[in-house]
């Protein structure tokens, strides 16, 4: 009998969009090309839980293909929404290796509430995001109602956005903490819509002209909101930052984006951060630091203000399979960073996790630290920017640091770079105001 060897991996190298869900990873392998048309991908859906990959073949979804986004259901466990660049939306129930279709969402099943492209039955649902009220917003491009929403009760509605949005080829979408919906328009800037009580109120288009966005280019490729509410925008000609997005809907207020410049000499001839790199994706980690995935030059990792490059990954200096980065996703629980390239997925153990609201579940790992272990000691469950001081039982401080988001890392060495002696060590932890405190014990065995 022939031997069939099936690797524990995604079924193919296609990784158009990656989505994390409480430690689980979903991969949408479909996509669209540079002019925004379907690529007719039939790879299905890939799912990573723990160390095991499960591949759900496209045959499970009938004619549904070009799956470009997976979004976890916000309230129903093991349910996801899958969006297709051609066939609308599916709500799916996942049970191990089996999957069942709960419902299809398209023009026919919503009695016309979700219009298709020119009444053809084609729906290119490019992206989804969740607001604070449990509404899932989605892009419905090339229609007269390009902004759609799935309400918590399952009702589907789509909205027109005035002249700026009529027929717009809207792709990526983001809901901000300030109640705005941002939609990338292919080669035509960004639509920003203000929500009130879950209903669109007004829409403004941001472009490359001064006074209406002043973007480096109207070919916007991505955007991300950081922990300070600032919007980082990637275009085919570099990076821009909108520091006060609330100004967009305020009369007589500027909402032009800023180009970040590093001018070390102060002579006014500084260099733009990331230059004119085409930036396909931006992700913000638990420490508010920025990951930039470029179209041809790998990955850049910077500090929170973007002006200091911390790391650079490329095909030549790292395990990246390609310098063409399609998507970046961060597992906020572990700090693991996933890079989707045109040649497959690569993961990297980052240092930052999402900060906790309280420190009720602080722990160290590994603990005890066994003889021969030389890796990092992780202290997790911390609030953002927690102060950590590690002492021996006599109270001598051997190490101190500030948490990266919700995690602090100790290499098991003292201030002189020497490995500490065997014994019990105490990690004294406090928030940045010194109000909330916690203590963790770490046993070192040499």
Over which residues does each language-model region extend?
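Short, glycine-anchored, charge-dense loop/turn motifs used at functional sites
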Residues: 387-398, 425
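Repeat-blade elements of multi-bladed beta-propeller folds
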Residues: 220, 325-326, 372-377, 423
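Edge beta-strands of extracellular beta-sandwich domains
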Residues: 437-442
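Short, surface-exposed loop/turn motifs with a glycine/proline- and acidic-biased composition
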Residues: 403-434
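Glycine-centered coil/turn sites that cap beta-strands in beta-rich domains
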Residues: 357-389, 407-410
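Surface-exposed loops/turns
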Residues: 322, 371, 384, 416, ...
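Interdomain boundary/hinge segments at the C-termini of tandem beta-sandwich modules
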Residues: 444-446
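Carboxylate-rich, polar loop motifs that coordinate divalent cations or form catalytic acidic clusters
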Residues: 1-361, 397, 428
